[in-house]
């Protein structure tokens, strides 16, 4: 399926132009053929008039001069032939040009006066015929039939030459027409390219709305998109502010509960209750932090940023190397230094931070970060040489809130945030075996 609107219109216009030319071609050929036949008829009629003016009847006999005014009648190889027949159909005279021709022609004498048609000689060659019934004896009806002929081959030669020339003319006209159509469509689609460029600038964060300098037919679309952008921005801000207000409103009750827990901890009999209370307080704090992260890291509707991968990996790994200095982790980078990911910086930091922290925590000593660009997508992965994940547990681990490591305390919030980020960017997360021997978290984002 052709997805380019300009190419669709161009192909449609080209098809119509070709069909028009194909319909025009036989019409022009027919018109030229008719015009050429009329010209030949008029020429033969003029030649008949020449013969009539030259003919005389003396003592009941037809007399013709030896040299006629039309030179073609006097040349043996000429294409114009002249004949005169009596009313019985007997040949009385033929021109010098017709001396070598063997045409068995019989006048019709049907009272029409003159007639234009075709006939053939003994060899099968076709001739145009102009036959005039005329009274040269002043009073006797149709005493003679004066006939002029011309070979059809000359007509066919002219028609063939015109046909070849017509092909060239129409072919050239078609190419010029297609070129003009292409230029017209290119000029007409400049507005669409301008709109596309502005959308690219919005996706990259270079501008916040579409301009008003577009054709009238596109203004409704641009106004609707601008309203959508403003509405999405306001809704996003309200969402962030609401969650921020909620978090701040819960801080004081949590602080009070923490203080009560500290007071209860001073009494030996309340230690178990205090432990449960503090665990729930910590869980509530983590959930609040998780929701705040979701609010701040979700992708904007139309804005699509690209962030360089190498600097972020360097920053995160420098920090993790200090935290896990005892492991002496060896980091391998399997991507181009210029590789970029279609994710905002904050979201990408959070996403990679969670995956790299898991890899550093569970590895034996080797971690690898890789990325590549595929047809229509960007893919990156984080893998380690740790214990890996059994195949039957992988689906559970990549579900929100499930934890890959149950040996250490936590709520699985980090991976849940990572999943939220991936889903907000229409991405996919998969868990495979690593070539290093451990687990490989693979993420794929669409780039179109």
UniProtKB/Swiss-Prot annotation:
What is the catalytic activity of this protein? ATP + protein L-histidine = ADP + protein N-phospho-L-histidine
- Give the observed phenotype of the deletion mutant: Deletion mutant displays significantly lower virulence than the wild-type strain. Also exhibits a constitutive polymyxin B resistance.
Q: Name one Pfam family in it.
A: HisKA
User: What are the TM regions of this chain, as residue ranges?
Assistant: 169-189
- Identify its membrane topology class: Single-pass membrane protein
Give coiled-coil spans as residue ranges: none
Enumerate the subcellular locations listed in this protein's record, separating them with semicolons.
Answer: Membrane
What function does the entry list?
Member of the two-component regulatory system PhoP/PhoQ that plays a role in the regulation of resistance towards polymyxin B and cationic antimicrobial peptides in response to limiting concentrations of Mg(2+). May function as a membrane-associated protein kinase that phosphorylates PhoP in response to environmental signals leading to activation of specific gene promoters.
Q: What is this protein called?
A: Two-component sensor PhoQ
